[in-house]
């Protein structure tokens, strides 16, 4: 930690997304080349400055309520995200990071029942996002092209479109075959 800032990152610095993307690409390529490869030493990549800054940027853009500690994104912005990220980095590096309990809220459902909702602290969301940034490319390498659930740049609408197109092809092939036989 340097001057209350994330190591190597001035508080006003632009997010070095290119460095994070390079890391992700490298992890993806390694995972794709060998399905049996075991990855070691990923933990130190989670607390890299560029990864934490990108995780913060994504958490900030998602917004959301404060967790059990009542610390909001706005309060962190006022205090300075550099100091906030430096604290996270130091805790992760020293092995002292422990996630906080999740704040539980209930939201009403259309049928009158309630659905439980867990709200993690902003701090925990940043660590979760940093972990996702590092591990996602490794898992992505193993997913099938036909898999759409909870994947980057894929949606339920795209899955439905693939099903619709495949269904049309099957229907046309069946119709053509049926006509040819009669």
Where in the sequence are the language-model features?
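Conserved pre-catalytic core of RNA-dependent polymerases
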Residues: 1-8, 13-175, 179-182
């Amino acid at each position: 930690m340097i001057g209350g800032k994330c190591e190597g990152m001035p508080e006003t610095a632009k997010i070095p997304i290119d460095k994070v993307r390079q890391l992700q690409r490298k992890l993806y390529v390694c995972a794709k080349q060998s399905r049996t490869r075991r990855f070691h030493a990923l933990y130190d990549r989670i607390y890299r400055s560029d990864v934490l800054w990108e995780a913060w940027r994504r958490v900030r853009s998602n917004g959301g309520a404060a967790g059990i500690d009542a610390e909001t994104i706005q309060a962190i912005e006022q205090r300075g995200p550099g100091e906030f990220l430096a604290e996270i980095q130091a805790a992760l590096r020293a092995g002292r990071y422990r996630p906080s309990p999740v704040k539980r809220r209930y939201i009403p459902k259309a049928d009158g029942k309630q659905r439980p909702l867990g709200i993690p602290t902003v701090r925990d969301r940043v660590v979760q996002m940093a972990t996702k940034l590092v591990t996602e490319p490794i898992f992505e390498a193993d997913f099938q092209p036909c898999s759409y659930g909870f994947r980057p740049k894929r949606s339920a609408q795209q899955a439905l479109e693939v099903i619709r197109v495949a269904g049309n092809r099957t229907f046309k092939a069946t119709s053509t075959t049926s006509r040819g036989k009669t």
